[in-house]
Amino acid sequence: MVTIRADEISNIIRERIEQYNREVTIVNTGTVLQVGDGIARIYGLDEVMAGELVEFDEGTIGIALNLESNNVGVVLMGDGLMIQEGSSVKATGKIAQIPVSEAYLGRVINALANPIDGRGKISASESRLIESPAPGIISRRSVYEPLQTGLIAIDSMIPIGRGQRELIIGDRQTGKTAVATDTILNQQGQNVICVYVAIGQKASSVAQVVTSLQERGAMEYTIVVAETADAPATLQYLAPYTGAALAEYFMYREQHTLIIYDDLSKQAQAYRQMSLLLRRPPGREAYPGDVFYLHSRLLERAAKLSSQLGEGSMTALPIVETQSGDVSAYIPTNVISITDGQIFLSADLFNAGIRPAINVGISVSRVGSAAQIKAMKQVAGKLKLELAQFAELEAFAQFSSDLDKATQNQLARGQRLRELLKQSQSAPLTVEEQIMTIYTGTNGYLDGLEIGQVRKFLVQLRTYLKTNKPQFQEIIASTKTLTAEAESFLKEGIQEQLERFLLQEKV
């Protein structure tokens, strides 16, 4: 029989008494009443905040969006297949936030900032709220530095400045993503951090963008935030805010950032789905009443910060998809009114082989002209005017057979100018190359060439000037002005190359 030793028992009791913790923790809990379609109705959670994170028994996280008199509507950040009626939920006391650090550069992450590229964890010591207030009026300064996209049509006629919000709008399959990715490629060596947010895209499309950026060495300064079409609506709704939080981290550290939201139509659809399932009253096109606020609070976070805050910037290029060119639909009109201009991509131009398919007539940049360099202003004014006159004449010429010589010349010039605006995908041009290209067109040097020869000649001209007249690029780069000296170098180079080209073509 085991002998019971009183001293051992008293020691154990003494230890237990010493270890006793008198701390009382109060946990705000609730019970699941109903769950399905990514929404859970919770009874209890009396002191929960709007937007607070809640945790279910089996580990799923949700956001409390609807605070009603007898229950709380929670949207789930996962499939929630293991959540059952009656299971318990606890409030975490936290609002959604993500870790942020330099280590995110070159990575592909989801809306919760978890890596999805299979390259291991990302170390981060700081965190930021996903929903942060936008900088106030005093914290900002007006846009004055250019953000070059590398596309002639945009940089000359619809210029974008650092800190601007410029909408890219058009039907499906008109090259909206291509314009955005070309802009990322053109930031190489410009000390700009890029964030590409893919919302509700096909996983294959996102993989294609990532591969294209990797091949050209652009992932070194880029972060990709992706929530594909099969992701829960909650995560598709959160993805743009996650991207904005990452871009803000760099902006407040005196760096320049570019963020692309591809696309906000899908985010609005995800938000509509959540709102209707939460039984919020539908408005126009069944979107909830606060869908304008959904986008305005996101896009207002893009800014050019004042000198006191370090002059960092966040430039936003939101993308919106239209249905058969209808710009007057609800989401397009909302985003047009929030942004500082729009680049309109036309399906007709795209099908006619004009790519990028930018409709220059109805595209505008409301603040970008202040950011254009002087040399570009000097050549772009004439280009814009001649293209506008050409568009008018072309419509008129369809109905008239006998045109006078001056009109024929103007039409011929317009066709060549339209040709010089065409660019291959992933082939951005430097601002000096753009200036020499536009100057060649607006000063009539292309008028003697066949339309089919224009692009071939321009490619050779850019190579020739780079090799034989490097002084031109040096003057533009240092003075940002098309000086008389630079113009004479340019004229000489164009004349020499034109003579060589015409001789080649004759052979």
Curated annotation (Swiss-Prot):
It is a peripheral membrane protein. It is found in: Plastid, Chloroplast thylakoid membrane. SUPFAM superfamilies: C-terminal domain of alpha and beta subunits of F1 ATP synthase, N-terminal domain of alpha and beta subunits of F1 ATP synthase, P-loop containing nucleoside triphosphate hydrolases. Belongs to the ATPase alpha/beta chains family. Its EC number is 7.1.2.2. The record marks S363 as: Required for activity. It holds the Pfam family ATP-synt_ab_N. One of its GO terms (molecular function) is ATP binding. Keywords: ATP synthesis, ATP-binding, CF(1), Chloroplast, Hydrogen ion transport, Ion transport, Membrane, Nucleotide-binding, Phosphoprotein, Plastid, Thylakoid, Translocase, Transport. It comes from the Eukaryota. The keyword Transport applies. It catalyses: ATP + H2O + 4 H(+)(in) = ADP + phosphate + 5 H(+)(out). This is ATP synthase subunit alpha, chloroplastic. The modification Phosphothreonine is found at T257. Coiled coil: none annotated. GO terms for cellular component: chloroplast thylakoid membrane; proton-transporting ATP synthase complex. It is an enzyme of class 7 (translocase). Produces ATP from ADP in the presence of a proton gradient across the membrane. The alpha chain is a regulatory subunit. ATP binds at G170, D171, R172, Q173, T174, G175, K176, T177. F-type ATPases have 2 components, CF(1) - the catalytic core - and CF(0) - the membrane proton channel. CF(1) has five subunits: alpha(3), beta(3), gamma(1), delta(1), epsilon(1). CF(0) has four main subunits: a, b, b' and c. The keyword Electron transport does not apply. It comes from Capsella bursa-pastoris.
